């Protein structure tokens, strides 16, 4: 964990390891407000639930890490990733990760696509299905019954899976007797 007062090129608290510019950086206001504002505007997730969380950024990915003083002892470690990836910049747009929607999905109040199990199986198999849904174009939370599956991209008439490739790869997926096509 990088202390908020440090930046790339500065010494660590024990002065034996130099910070590397590729390590995650703390996200501070106003960028933090922009990132959390996106989640609130697009999905209705209140910013207040992130009060006890740090945001870190490395490349195009934003990571979430719980604030915990016990982690300060790890400050001297070389860090490649930390916490849970919650957002990614895709070009000029923010995309929530499926992990973020699974973790905070209970707070999502808008842009939710609820699929029947057979539709979900088709989306997993084909990566895209046709249909109109009562959401605005853009990233959406996909669920079936009460299970949050992850992120999708809704374009008028099309729902495109944004699930991580490994999420259903090399698995026989079965949900209430509906098998995934291999």
Q: What residues fall within each predicted segment?
A:
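Polybasic, low-complexity RNA-engagement segments
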Residues: 2-182
């Amino acid at each position: 964990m990088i202390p908020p007062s440090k930046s790339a090129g500065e010494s660590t608290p024990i002065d034996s390891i130099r910070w590397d510019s590729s390590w995650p950086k703390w996200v501070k206001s106003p960028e933090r407000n922009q990132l959390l504002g996106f989640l609130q505007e697009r999905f209705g997730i209140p910013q207040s639930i992130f009060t006890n969380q740090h945001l870190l950024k490395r490349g195009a990915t934003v990571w979430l890490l719980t604030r915990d003083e016990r982690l300060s002892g790890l400050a001297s470690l070389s860090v490649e990733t930390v916490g849970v990836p919650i957002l990614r910049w895709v070009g000029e747009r923010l995309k929530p990760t499926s992990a973020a929607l699974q973790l905070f999905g209970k707070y999502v109040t808008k842009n939710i696509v609820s699929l029947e199990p057979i539709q979900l199986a088709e989306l997993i198999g084909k990566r895209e299905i046709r249909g109109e849904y009562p959401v605005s174009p853009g990233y959406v939370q996909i669920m079936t019954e009460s299970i949050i599956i992850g992120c999708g991209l809704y374009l008028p008439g099309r729902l495109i899976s944004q699930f991580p490739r490994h999420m259903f790869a090399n698995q026989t997926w079965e949900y209430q007797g509906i098998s995934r096509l291999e």
